[in-house]
Every structure is written in structure tokens, then in C-alpha cells.
């Protein structure tokens, strides 16, 4: 069948997707599309994503540089990698160097505030700065793990080894927060390179970190400049172009649910494995025999701030709801008061009687909503007949991310673990779901099971887990043959 170059789009032009469906080109898309641009058709949804030529070329150049740097890293010593992480951390810790980064961040924050954008994670606070430095120090002092024996099988006259090896270029699309640098550059420890796009709110800060800290640290360690590439672009099209580049070894997306799902679909249809950190919100199921003091601690410590592992839905088993709902509400109010805030409660019909007069009534579909609060903690309450119903609701409505069962017997806890469809399961507070907190390693992202279970890996993606496996044969007896 003949093929050609896409040069123009017409309003109303039908575009097939998904094998048996079509979508139409809008007048706006047709007017914007010119020769040299690219059209990405998302096969899951029919979304038509316009990638202007300039964005494609910018991304293509960055990935080309990163791929060349990846091959160059094979000749780089582990000490050089340690020197890079140490130099990066030292520059962030140097007040004179950091002053330029701080000024850029202040400008980003002012711009975001003027546009009524959230700045909760945009401000490069002293704590965020310290956490970035600490994360880089972890990578600085981590043993080299680019070539590690995983297994060995001996035969007469020969043996084979499986060995961990670097994967390639890792593409990131991050939300607008500065601390992602420490996460993204962690892949260099295992011999990989990185290309990333950061949310436009934090782009000025990202440019400053690159020029004041990353680039000098790469140069001082004699590492290729392409080992860490920032895509200097504000358009979402840069992210689409990056994830549609089949030369990536892995695509990692962090941000809002829809945008992350769309990016993941783009990556997968181009043959790129994807790790998606999208919709979050943890669930807590409260058994009738739950200890009130333990329950109060679990709730309070799960609502200290809004991140992906914050308590979002609380399921109370009916037999204990009247006794334990006040404990949940009081603990939630306590967490809110520590922030100078108030607790916002959403109640499914079954929970209206125990949720308090100020509760906001919601349909059952609200169980699938992650409350993206900034200041006032928000939770949804639902009353269920038993733990089995709570599991059923979680598996139907949640993003299948994190769940805890408070109380219950050992049999209840095991059944909960066996039947709940989540990568993270516990019996206490939900905020433990974090790579640094749980595994002492800076994380690149956390994945839910909303799009299915993950092949051969856990829900925490760290720099140490980005690798492939090679097999090497050693022949002693060269008479060996098949």
C-alpha cells in the first residue's frame, strides 16, 4: 500500500483509531497544522495531539544527545559518577551558587501566583533544598551498580551468568516542582541518561539549576553534557514528542491523572515501557474491632499534607461505624488544626448519618475522586456491610493505589491483602508509601494499578531499578557444541 507524508489536515477529516473507531479533525487543529508538523493519534481515546515541527526537532536533538551520552558512559568510572552527584550537591549547598537558583524560583512563584496557580510544590523552600541535597548525597555514596551478577548456572565445561546492565535513555515528564532534579539524575548511578520536561511553572527554576549546578557538575566530573538534558519548552507538545520517541528505554510521567494516562498511552503505542505516577489517594478500611487510639493515629498521620499517599477515602464497617466515625472525624479535625485549616468531609449516602451535619453528600461515584486539596484536608466517608464490600468498592472505584485495613483478625488482614487489588497494602497510616521513607532510596515515581498490574516490578520506581539484564557465557571446554 502506498504511503506518503502528512502535509495538511482538513476540518472534519476522519482519522481512524483503536482499530474500529474514527475521530474528526477540528477546525482549530486543521488551521494550526502545517507541513513538517506531526500528529500523534492516541489509540485508546482518539485524542489528536499536534506536535509542531520545532518541538519535535528540539526533543529529537535532546534524545540524540542523551543516546550518545549513554554509550559514552560505558567508558566512565563509578568514581566519576560519584563526583557528579557530589558536585551537584555541593553547588546546591553553596549559598552563593544557590542565590541565582533562588532568584529564578522567586520569579517562577510570582508568575504562578499572578496566574492564580498553586505554588505549594513550586516554592524551593529550605526543606526542599535540604531534601534535594540529601537525595544527591545518597546517590553519591551508593556503590556502583551498573554491572552486577544476578545469577549463575554451571554446566560441564562452561557456565552462564545473568548480569544487570544499564537500560538507556530515560524520558521524564514532571509536574512543575524543582525537587525532581534529584530524582531524575539518579538514573545516572546505574549508567543511564535522562531527558526531561518540567511543568512550565517551574521552568525558570529548572533552567537555573541546570546552568548553576547540573552543567558545572557534569563538566567537573568529565561526563558527557548529554547525560542530563532539559527540554527547554513550555508546550505540552514537547512531552508528547518525547514519549513518542521510540529510542527511549523508559518513559516516566508524574502529574495529574488524565495527563499522565495520556502520556502513558502515547509511550506504550510507540513501544516505550512506561512508569506512570498519576491518580493517587489512599483508602483506609476500618474493621469493627479497630482500636480507637490506633485509628486516630493512623488517620491523623495520613492527613498531614496532600500528596498521592494521603488518606482520601475511609470505609467504616457498619457494626463499628457509630463508635468509630467520631474517632475518624476528630482525628481529621486534629490534622487540619495543625495546619490552621478545617476538615472537609464528603459522605456517601450510607455514611450521612455518621458523617456530621457539615458533611457534603456525594453519589457513590465520588469514591473515584481524588480530592486535590491545598489547605483544608478532604476525605470521603462510606459505611459498608463488611470488609468484603469495602474491598469490592476499592477494586471498582479507586485508582488501585494504596489501602490499609485498621483492626481485624489475622485472617481478616490476610484476606484483605489477598483480595485488594493494590500494589501498596498496610495496616496503619497510609503515608508510608514513599521510596525514600520505605526503602531509603530517592524515588522516580509511584505507580498505581489503574491500568493493570506491573510486569516484574513493584510500584516504587527508583534510579536503582532502571536496568536491563544481559547474559554472558564463559566456555572452558572449546569442544563444546550443540
Model-predicted regions and their roles:
Residues 319-420, 424-442, 453, 457:
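NAD(P)-dependent aldehyde/semialdehyde dehydrogenase
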Residues 2-51, 57-67, 400, 408-482:
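C-terminal segments
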